[in-house]
Amino acid sequence: MTVNYTERYAVHPDDYEMYNSAMLRENFHVGGLFVADEVNLVYTQIDRFIVGGACPADTPLKLDTIDALKAVHFLDRRELGAVNVGGAGRITVDGETYDIAYKEALYVGAGAKEVVFESVDAANPAKFYLNSATAHHSYPNKKVGLDDAIK
């Protein structure tokens, strides 16, 4: 399984004032994140932030590193937040499995070697919205369930 990614670059404020709708969409809209059985990422040159989606339907999806990171593992120097916006799913981090229901999230600390996304039901796949940023310290993984949310 390959992780698909594109790169985005910073835009000078004087430049984007001249953009038409098509150019604004091309430079700022992030679409196509939730394609069945794919991990799709957008790596931005703005603080090296990554936004993405993982939609495991028929097969588990491993979060492999991408060339832009120049790292052996995706989370060697990064942390990850994954929010499930689809059907029930699971995320396995270095052998520990977390059940992640709709609207629940998992924080994965820097240094994790293997992250795998799965769906409970292929007919109603999990859709994990991903955010990743550089990290200079590793914190423990933490599931944030609906009961943990401030209401």
Regions found by a protein language model. Give the residues of each.
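Short amphipathic beta-strand/extended segments with alternating polar/hydrophobic composition
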Residues: 62-64, 99-103, 142-144
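Short, conserved beta-strand element in jelly-roll/cupin
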Residues: 74-90
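Short acidic-glycine-tyrosine-enriched beta hairpin
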Residues: 93-110
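Short, charged beta-turn/beta-strand-edge "cap" motif at the junction between a beta-strand
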Residues: 112-115
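Surface-exposed beta-loop interaction hotspot
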Residues: 117-151
